[in-house]
Amino acid sequence: MDYSDDDMIDNESGEENNSDGGGNESYNYNAAVDTIILSEKSYVIIKEEEILKLQRDDIERVSTILFLSQVEAIVLLLHYHWCVSKLEDEWFTDEERIRKTVGILKEPVVDVNGTEVDIQCGICFESYTRKEIASVSCGHPYCKTCWTGYITTKIEDGPGCLRVKCPEPSCYAVVGQDMIDEVTEKKDKDKYYRYFLRSYVEDGKKMKWCPSPGCECAVEFGESSGYDVACLCSYRFCWNCSEDAHSPVDCETVSKWIFKNQDESENKNWILANSKPCPKCKRPIEKSHGCNHMTCSASCGHRFCWICGKSYSDHYACNNYVEDADHDKRTLLQSEIKRYTHYYVRWVENQSSRLKAMSDLEKFQSVQLKQLSDNQCKPKIDLQFIVDAWLQIIECRRVLKWTYAYGYYLDNLAKRPLFEYLQGEAETGLERLHHCAENELKQFFIKSEDPSDTFNAFRMKLTGLTKVTKTYFDNLVKALENGLADVTKSSEESADFLETQKLYDAYISEGCFF
């Protein structure tokens, strides 16, 4: 492939672009998610071809305004991390300083005589003709073979190849894309331009790539109080920390929770809480039977009492009380591990339920939707309420999952009753909705002669449950985002709030078609 100054950044545009990041089109539930969850987007999803255009526009602008070649404009933009305004301000303030800093020389420091027949390469020290020699703005001569080896090595080393300098150790002249195009092979050239494209997103502060494997979209983020974004590939993530979307829990809590789940010290705590060291060899021993007469395994073989730790050779009784700091420590650890397990198991289970719901939605859209449409003699658009229900389930499972991480780190005991009440009501509502969508829908996949009345009742029930569940979770999310502020009210106001909420819940339950 030939590369010119005009199409210098077009190398990726000819590649096949999977705009949905490898996702299944029938499983792209993002548009509906936006309707249900996001009242107003504060971000823009940008496809790869759009990034190329933005990149090209910036290069054209800098080249035109500063009266530079595109090669030089690219060097400057890379140095300034694609911040055009900062580049222009500093260039017009002190052009000479900027040229020296980035390595764009006006005049060569080495003047190779154009009439000279034999020119010595500065790397291999062999003599070459003028056509076999190449140099950048500094003029240091190197044969094209050495240039190829030098630049290829830089490309193999990673994105640093975008800022390669002249091979001469004391020279600061930059190697432009014209040299890359001239001396590298196609596979290395393609790798270089891949780094070049990604630099437009990764070097800036307002864009990030979607972290979903295989997705080639980026997200440009605006001003917002929340960081959750939904990519075109259906993946939802936090723009701030790049983890899975975790509102209403903040990034710091998520980071601590994930680290705790991966921390090997939790295994050590389990050992401390559920075992005792052999009094002789100090190896931890777990008691698996009722008898307190313990025998250490392996080469030790020491026999001792599990209760008091004394050797059985001189053991008579251990009913006398002796202060045992280790026992107190084990009790505390057992309590903490039990507490952690409570929250962790529910965090995992809700994630598992969410993934199952996503799979069920995919199956419904790809297989069951047409079948249900035929059986009930209804157009697919009239069955959108089922898709909406599954989307609500998926989102609610995500929120509920992270509320368990929130609950684990909730140290304010005064706030815990309100938190657990709101969480419990939301979870109960979600279970009703999930059960209805997962189990009660099955009967309608069997064709019946007069399906209308029964199916219409199901539609009303599922639609009602979807709305009610959304209300529960909206209340839960709002409360957590506000730091459970209702607890700061007087006890009388808090009691009134809970009583009002319970009356509302009772009213809703009566209307839930149960």
Curated annotation (Swiss-Prot):
Keywords: Metal-binding, Repeat, Transferase, Ubl conjugation pathway, Zinc, Zinc-finger. Zn(2+) 6 binds at C305, C308, H315, C318. Zn(2+) 1 binds at C121, C124, C143, C146. GO terms for biological process: protein ubiquitination. It is an enzyme of class 2 (transferase). The active site is at C291. It catalyses: [E2 ubiquitin-conjugating enzyme]-S-ubiquitinyl-L-cysteine + [acceptor protein]-L-lysine = [E2 ubiquitin-conjugating enzyme]-L-cysteine + [acceptor protein]-N(6)-ubiquitinyl-L-lysine. GO terms for molecular function: ubiquitin-protein transferase activity; zinc ion binding. Zn(2+) 3 binds at C210, C215, C231, C233. Pfam families: Ariadne, IBR, IBR_1. Gene3D superfamilies: 1.20.120.1750, Zinc/RING finger domain, C3HC4 (zinc finger). InterPro entries: Ariadne, E3_UB_ligase_RBR, IBR_dom, TRIAD_supradom, Znf_RING, Znf_RING/FYVE/PHD. Its cofactor is Zn(2+). A zinc finger (IBR-type) spans 190-251. It comes from the Eukaryota. Might act as an E3 ubiquitin-protein ligase, or as part of E3 complex, which accepts ubiquitin from specific E2 ubiquitin-conjugating enzymes and then transfers it to substrates. This is Probable E3 ubiquitin-protein ligase ARI10. It comes from Arabidopsis thaliana. The lineage of its organism: Eukaryota, Viridiplantae, Streptophyta, Embryophyta, Tracheophyta.
